[in-house]
Amino acid sequence: MIATELENIIRNSNDLDSMQEAAVKLSELQYSRFLEIALEYLEQDEVDAYFQALLIDCIVPADIERVLPCLLHREKPIEAYLLGDIMKNMMYLSPQDNARKYIPEINERYQKLTDNEKESIREYYEEFKNQYSL
């Protein structure tokens, strides 16, 4: 498939599996176009959080900082699994110095989760706390 076809699937499909597959392929085929689309989708509150987590996973380490403001500055609460994915990517992908400015916002978002939600991502949060000395 060519990049245009993959982009059409991402934008027009109602099938989340097809959208995810197309996003992964587009990230491998034409990364710069994928990044534009990913940033667009990450800014939208109504986009499925699992799809947003997949987009984050496809973004290369050098660009993860471009993603964080899209997610952390919106008013809608971030689902626990998406917040866990953000923490995971910050620990393994971002340089520690660059990621530090997002720590207070991530910690604040974590504190707003319910006890069950916190428990579901506790492992990521504990690693995150240890790495950033919270």
Description of each model-found segment:
Residues 1-10, 29-43, 64-76, 96-108, ...:
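Amphipathic alpha-helical scaffolding segments comprising HEAT/armadillo-like alpha-solenoid repeats
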Residues 10-14, 42-46, 59, 75-79, ...:
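Alpha-solenoid helical repeat architecture
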Residues 17-29, 40, 50-64, 73, ...:
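Structural detector for internal amphipathic alpha-helices that build alpha-solenoid repeat scaffolds
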Residues 102-105, 109-126:
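Extended amphipathic alpha-helical coiled-coil/heptad-repeat regions
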